[in-house]
Regions:
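Beta-strand->loop->alpha-helix junctions that form or flank phosphate-binding loops
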Residues: 36-39, 131, 215, 233-244, ...
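N-terminal glycine-rich phosphate/pyrophosphate-binding loops that anchor nucleotide-derived ligands
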Residues: 1-87, 123, 151, 159-164, ...
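Helix N-cap motif at beta-to-alpha junctions
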Residues: 265-272
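Active-site-proximal betaalpha loop/short-helix elements
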Residues: 17, 102, 191-259
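Short, compositionally biased
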Residues: 176-192
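Small-aliphatic-rich amphipathic alpha-helix that forms the alpha element of a beta-alpha
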Residues: 69-96, 109-120, 196-202, 220-226
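Glycine-rich anion-binding loops of enzyme active sites
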Residues: 54-56, 61-63, 91-177, 290, ...
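Acidic, Ser/Thr/Pro-rich beta/coil linker or hinge segments at domain junctions
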Residues: 2-3, 13, 29, 281-324
Length: 324
């Protein structure tokens, strides 16, 4: 595939385009509060709580996934929330959910998926709300986490000259129900998953990264774009350096939600230690690019370089840190 064709495919990817609704909505909710350290644009809001911070996040499941496989949707709703907290260098504490279903059968399938994920990750659902008789099926989960204030990882603090590192668990499969979901976590034990999740906490506590984010359903490049928007920085990404399963094409992989995947920025002197930390928990981590001052995301492939996003004209979410 030619680079120009790949760029066109990524720009038109629905997982990226649907993020553009965020910024106009957020403008209605901006206000000052002395206890809020960071909010919109981060994977979780950060609330001052003495020597610690509370982390608060929420995710709703894409209706396409709910229609394709309600049980997998329930599982993923837990998975994505836990990763939002982990990406901040935090520890997940508990979740609440809002479930709307059109039938008892759908309710059973979704709740079965939630139960499997709760058992797998050890983070409880402690309350919520259910609509048992709606004309639609929807699931939203909110999560509370915590972190030490001095070990917090934000996505809005990347710096010029930082290396860009991608860490992902390649031991998995494309989920049979949804072509844009990579499933590694159901193939791992609870102990293995706990160690993988704790990597981000270790990185935060040792101040090894300057910024970080979990890779979302906007895919790897969409997620990098969001990190660059919030940091008001640019990047150059070498597409041939991106770790991926051999059996999956690059164009497909770049649109996949990887399940256990994080994008990080770090100083050169910390890169080797970061790679080793992920390798110890059976994750693949590679340097795939670097941060630049010029506010655009450039991609390199087979000796050619092109601009994927030029900010702010191009936009993923339109958010800059806790501002928009």
């Amino acid at each position: 595939m030619e680079l120009s064709e790949l760029i066109s495919e990524i720009r038109s990817f629905e997982g990226i385009k649907r993020k553009r609704f965020i910024s106009p909505l957020v403008k209605r909710f901006l206000f000052d509060n002395s206890r809020v350290i960071a909010s919109f644009g981060e994977d979780a809001a950060v609330i001052d709580f003495g020597e610690e911070v509370l982390l608060l996040a929420a995710d709703g499941i894409w209706d396409k996934l709910m229609k394709a496989d309600p049980e997998w949707a329930g599982y993923c709703a837990v998975l994505v929330n836990i990763h939002d907290i982990a990406a901040m260098g935090g520890e997940p504490v508990a979740m609440v959910d809002v479930l709307s279903v059109s039938s008892a059968e759908k309710c059973l399938r979704v709740s079965r998926g939630i139960q499997k994920a709760v058992e797998k990750f050890g983070v409880p659902v402690v309350g919520g709300h259910v609509h048992p008789d709606t004309s639609y099926d929807a699931l939203d989960i909110a999560i509370l986490g915590k972190a030490k204030k001095n070990s917090l990882i934000l996505s809005s603090t990347a710096e010029k000259g930082d290396l860009l590192i991608y860490a992902v668990d390649l031991h998995g499969r494309i989920h049979p129900s949804f072509p844009f979901n990579w499933d590694s976590t159901t193939l791992r034990s609870s102990d293995e998953l706990k160690k993988q999740i704790e990597c981000m906490k270790i990185l935060g506590e040792n101040r090894l990264v300057t910024a970080g984010k979990d890779v979302s359903n906007s895919g790897l490049l969409g997620t990098i774009g969001m990190l660059l928007e919030t940091s008001v920085k640019g990047a150059v990404v070498n597409l041939e350096s991106i770790p991926k399963p051999e059996e999956i094409s690059l164009s497909h992989w770049l649109k996949v939600y990887p399940g256990m995947g994080f994008i990080l920025t770090a100083k050169d002197e910390n890169a080797d230690e970061i790679l080793k930390i992920f390798q110890r928990v059976k994750m693949r981590a590679e340097v795939i690019g670097f941060i630049q001052e010029e506010w655009k995301l450039e991609v390199e492939f087979k000796g050619e370089k092109r601009v994927l996003f030029s900010f702010p004209e191009d936009s993923v979410t339109g958010l800059r840190g806790s501002r928009c």
